[in-house]
Amino acid sequence: MAGRQSHKKIDVRNDTSTRYKGKLYGIFVNYMGEKYAQQLVENMYSNYNDVFVEIYNKMHNALRPTLVKLAGAGATFPLWQLVNEAIYAVYLTHKETASFLVTKYVARGVPAMTVKTLLAEVGNQLKELVPAVAEQIGSVTLDHTNVVSTVDNIVTSMPALPNSYAGVLMKTKVPTVTPHYAGTGTFSSMESAYKALEDIERGL
């Protein structure tokens, strides 16, 4: 058929990385030219791979039997939401405490025991994959009895990390400084920042 280019199908590899990079490249090549678009797309794909393929896919595959056991195959949707929220918002960015997550999902009709069991499972699996989480949880094996107190302690002692932290944590142990944007050279020291502000005020 005209316009379908069906004869070309054999030339194009149809795996995820090719499709993903191809779509992104098509978008960015118009903005920044071939060389930079190529670099950007490679970079984006490697981030996608590190986070989603290496972390989320592995977690989902490991937890699937547990979810089906807890909810039956047809009712796993809210539990998948719980798993993803636990990975990102609780363990990686410390935006939510474990007790908050329990309250939230109990209100949505998930039994507290199920929520705690899953939270503990997520923590135990993440420990194997993400060095920083292993470092935070330590040698404790999480279960439904200790997960809330242990995780609440971790979250409240280092609360509300910036979203970019999730990517940092995926690959390294806990950095010594919280990776908020450090500022430009002149503004990263408090003295020069205040001095600059005073100069501005004088000029007003």
UniProtKB/Swiss-Prot annotation:
<comment type="subunit">
    <text>Heterodimer composed of major capsid protein 1 and major capsid protein 2.</text>
</comment>
<comment type="function">
    <text>Self-assembles to form a helical, filamentous nucleocapsid mesuring 1980 nm in length and 24 nm in width. Together with capsid protein 2, wraps arounds the DNA and maintains it in an A-form. Capsid proteins probably maintain the DNA in A-form by non-specific desolvation and specific coordination of the DNA phosphate groups by positively charged residues. This certainly protects the viral DNA under conditions such as the extreme desiccation of its host.</text>
</comment>
<protein>
    <recommendedName>
        <fullName>Major capsid protein 1</fullName>
    </recommendedName>
</protein>
<keyword id="KW-0946">Virion</keyword>
<keyword id="KW-0238">DNA-binding</keyword>
<dbReference type="GO" id="GO:0003677">
    <property type="term" value="F:DNA binding"/>
</dbReference>
<dbReference type="GO" id="GO:0019029">
    <property type="term" value="C:helical viral capsid"/>
</dbReference>
